Regions:
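Beta-rich ligand-binding surfaces for carbohydrates and other polyanions
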Residues: 440-564
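Active-site histidine-anchored catalytic micro-motif
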Residues: 25-440
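Generic structural signal for beta-strand residues in well-ordered domains
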Residues: 21-23, 146, 279, 468, ...
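Beta-rich carbohydrate-recognition modules and glycan-binding surfaces
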Residues: 6
């Protein structure tokens, strides 16, 4: 959303056209789901959405109108949670079906408003903000959006309630509500409205003057106003005296008007998918399991953690997010031989935890290897204590939070049948960057991470091949055993150093330090062609490919490996 002297313009860019719809006002929907921000009294008790709306219209709206006279706030009260007598819900008690209710309300009212602000409790805010991107968007089996969010959805809450209600005197009129003293609720509310006015086409969390990507946040503090942070991805905007935006960090939104949720067909597709997810989500439970020091016996092949895994699998858990130590290390139950050694004399049994995870994987449970450390990236091959995990089917969460890993896995499983995805396709999607929740491991995207600098690399999701931009020789793709697979000039020896750029015209170009093109696919489109360089498949399955996919035209524009 761009502000000009004429008002607000909502812009959709595609490769072949540009349309603009002039707006001289903004309508923002405030959805109160509950939480501290809308509690009053001693002890704190939730207000109904209607009570909070009345108080906000009286106390907050005049202040907002002074700063944003062209913005109208609408307090919607129709969304209620059936498990609560007040209709609002402490986020401690939210369940996955409640995420679907929020998403359904947004989609049902999408055409009415220019943006949405969700007031939410802080206890599980990072789960909700991680779930909503996967509920509000539709994508194909390759992870490319087919119905994409085009408006802001900002989630916020507070550590201190918004309003104060004095004790009721024995006689006389009841005291009116007032703004609470030293509350972060007021700042977070106003900041969220300001953030929604930016028109960022993604789900965000606004807290303590910063706007974060919703599927990147973690709750880091229970008692201070800086309750949330995004350790693995920078803030999208900061509110000081003025709002400072970091546009290069924001999601680009729909690639064209045809896949925007402003398009009636795309919106209908999103609603259809959400209906299917809502029907299936309770049947696809996913749980988190942290690594912790617990008893195990190598000779007896027993372990407390193994018993927990077996019990959970027996209850129908469809996904298991391991919150491992460090870079993705998880106890196996046999430190020296996680998988055992049946050829030894006497035979060495596999670790009990290894065996339990192997059985869960065989039974169809998706296992994701995350980390309980708040920042950094999973690299389970760095230590022997984590290198065994791929053998039991564990997928790397890379730099995803455990919350994003859980919600993403659960929602993809719930959407699989309706979208016709196989189990292997779901596993691939879990590891792909769909809505900014994870770093791009296997792709260069012209709209988000377009450049491969010297020393940087992308790789196959299973690690069987890597394309590295060698500082001396330029781009070289090799198998994990070092076998040469591809280079722009036919061999590593003929290579030249530079920057490999996936351009937004669909052309993949190698530039030298003087920005002279050394090599190119020469498949560019002058009218634009948002594209991605991607490694798919595996050397082990003999289906490895390196190709340029034009996701504007929905077609492969160049196949670099294998070469015909």
């Amino acid at each position: 959303l761009i502000k000009s002297s004429f008002g607000y313009w909502q812009i959709y860019t595609s490769d072949r056209n540009l349309t603009a719809n002039k707006r001289d006002y903004m309508d923002i929907c405030i959805i109160n789901t509950g939480g501290t921000i809308s509690c009053i009294g001693e002890p704190l008790a939730p207000m109904s959405a209607a009570e909070f709306a009345t108080a906000s219209q009286t106390i907050l709206n005049p202040i907002v109108a002074e700063t944003f006279p062209d913005t109208t706030l609408f307090y919607e009260t129709a969304l209620t949670f059936p498990e609560s007598s007040t209709g609002t819900l402490d986020s401690t008690n939210l369940q996955p079906s409640d995420w679907c209710l929020m998403a359904q309300y947004i989609l049902d009212n999408y055409a009415t408003y220019d943006g949405f602000v969700i007031l939410h409790g802080t206890d599980s805010m990072d789960f909700t903000s991680s779930a909503l991107p996967f509920l509000l968007n539709v994508f194909d089996a390759q992870g490319f959006g087919t119905a994409v969010l085009s408006k802001p959805v900002i989630v916020t809450g507070s550590q201190v309630p918004m309003f104060y209600k004095a004790p009721t005197p024995p006689s006389g009129p009841k005291p009116a509500l007032t703004l609470n003293f030293n509350t972060d609720a007021y700042q977070n509310f106003c900041g969220s409205v300001a953030a929604a006015r930016l028109g960022i086409p993604e789900v965000g969390v606004y807290f303590d003057s910063k706007l974060y990507r919703g599927d990147r946040v973690l709750k880091i503090n229970a008692s201070e106003f800086r309750a949330f942070d995004s350790p693995n991805y920078p803030a999208l905007a900061e509110y000081g005296i003025e709002m400072t935006q970091y546009g290069d960090l924001m999601l680009p939104g729909p690639v064209g008007a045809d896949v925007s949720l402003d398009n009636a067909t795309a919106l209908a597709a999103a609603k259809t998918q959400l209906t299917a997810i809502t029907a299936a989500i309770d049947s696809n439970p996913v749980m988190q399991l942290p690594a912790f020091p617990a008893p195990y016996s190598v000779p007896n092949a027993t372990a407390v953690i193994a018993d927990l895994i077996t019990a959970c699998a027996g209850q129908g858990i469809k996904g298991l997010v391991l919150e491992s130590y460090g870079e993705g290390n998880f106890p196996s139950g046999n430190p020296d031989h996680p998988a055992g050694d049946p050829t030894a004399t006497p035979p060495i049994p596999a670790g009990a935890i290894y065996t339990a995870l192997e059985a869960a994987n065989t039974a169809g449970t998706i296992i994701v290897d995350s980390t309980q450390v708040i920042a950094g990236t999973v690299n389970n091959s760095a230590y022997a204590s984590g290198a065994w995990l791929p053998n039991v089917g564990a997928l790397s969460a890379s730099d995803m939070t455990p919350m994003a890993s859980l919600t993403k896995t659960m929602i993809l499983l719930s959407a699989a049948t309706a979208n016709g995805w196989t189990a292997d396709q779901v596993k691939t999607l879990i590891q792909l960057n769909l809505f900014g929740e994870i770093m791009n491991v296997s792709r260069l995207d012209s709209r988000t991470n377009a450049t491969l600098l010297p020393g940087q690399s992308i790789m196959a999701l299973d690690g069987s091949a890597k394309l590295i931009n060698d500082p001396s020789s330029g781009p070289i793709m090799t198998a994990s055993d070092g076998t040469f697979l591809w280079a722009p000039f036919g061999s590593a020896a003929a290579g030249k150093p530079g920057r490999l750029v996936m351009q937004n015209d669909g052309n993949l170009v190698l530039y030298n330090a003087s920005h002279t093109a050394l090599w190119a696919t020469n498949m560019g489109d002058a009218d634009g062609g948002s594209s991605v360089l991607m490694i798919t498949g595996s050397t082990g399955a003999t289906n490895l490919t390196l190709s340029v996919y034009n996701y504007s035209a929905k077609s492969v524009s160049a196949t670099l490996y294998p070469q015909s």
